[in-house]
Amino acid sequence: MNVLAKTPVMRITKIKDHIGAEVTGVDLTKPIDEETRQRLYDAAVDNVALVIRDQKFTPTQYANAARLFGELMEDQNRRYLAPGEPMVSTLSNHNKDSKGNQAKVAKAATWHTDHTNQEFPPKFTMLYAVELPDSGGGTGVCNMRDAYEALPDDLKARIDDMKTANTLISTVRMDIGNPDVLRDQQNAEGGPMIHPLVRTHPERGTKAIWFHTGKTEKILGMEPKETQEFLAELLEEAIKPEFSYVHEY
């Protein structure tokens, strides 16, 4: 008698009330139907952080899995690409800059939103761990939609119409930046990219706090130093344990 292997059933389980969901029972190296793809997409949008368990990717398989969530965006730093896959970048403390020194790319231990200096920043960031340190190396994510809603009304009213001027690396961080990135900044054409400090989600209509302290040159109407002080205070107000999830790979 032949016994057919059971097909795993994809399950999506919430991790915390305000953020995070865990996905099991799906292999993204294999084709999936549109209903499954849509469930994954909606879970990512609605839960902010989506943990998809038990995956094993080559760089190309990883890029194909990422395409399930939308069109891919090239990383602005083209120096540290995965072998044979131009749409996948590596974050590693083994990377070297053009002078042969350890590249300053690994210690991203500040709250930020990726690529705010781009006209069309990405909707999602996708991470896959290949090699881990003995300790540390987790990734923290915060639901800045719920964090925004929890702000005092007067602070929400104050930031609703604020706009930020964004560059590849802000002036106040020039002294700690990767020299190759600094050179890219100096050679960049055009002025800073202007974005709202509070963005409205195009599909859900929800508002969220949205900025990158390392790329925000200033809030329009403020000086750079005043901007950094204000953003630090805003993060202090917004980042709460109930809105945050730290993923340990």
Each language-model region and where it sits:
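Non-heme Fe(II) oxygenase catalytic core, chiefly the N-lobe of the double-stranded beta-helix
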Residues: 2-249
